Every structure is written in C-alpha cells, then in structure tokens.
Amino acid sequence: MTMLSKGSRGYQVKVAQSLLILNGCSCGSYGADGVFGSATLSAVRKYQRAKGLAADGIVGPNTWNALLGL
C-alpha cells in the first residue's frame, strides 16, 4: 500500500479513512472523503497511539498492517 500523509488524496485515503472510522477514530464531519486533512491526521495519530505505533501521522507499512489486521 502507498504511504499516505497530510495532503494525500484519492481512493487509498478513502480506504484508510474508512478503516479508521471502523476502529472508532473520527475523520471529521465529511467522513471518508478521500482527502487527508487535519481531521484525518488527528485520527491517524489517535489510532497509532492506541495500537502502540509511532504516532507520526503517516499511514505507512506498520499502520496499514494494523488497520488491515495483518
């Protein structure tokens, strides 16, 4: 999977946002809109902290694996 960070856009962002929402991390009032903005950044950091990952706000290999249950 592609690394995602603030400013990323597209289908993979929408997938990551959907998985974050399913795991109880709100991505803001627009939900899974495919735009990695401030609300998604906060959701990623919250999720990473909850999973004991480095809370860098980047959806990289470790965060993808956790989101996908791998």
Which residues does each predicted region cover?
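Extracellular LysM carbohydrate-binding repeats and other cell-envelope/extracellular binding modules
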Residues: K46, K51-L70
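Extended, structured, electrostatic nucleic-acid-contact surfaces
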Residues: I21-Y30, R45-A55
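N-terminal, helix-rich and Lys/Arg-enriched segments in bacterial and organellar proteins
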Residues: A16-L20, R45, W64
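Acidic, Ser/Thr/Pro/Gly-enriched interdomain connector segments
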Residues: M1-G34, A39
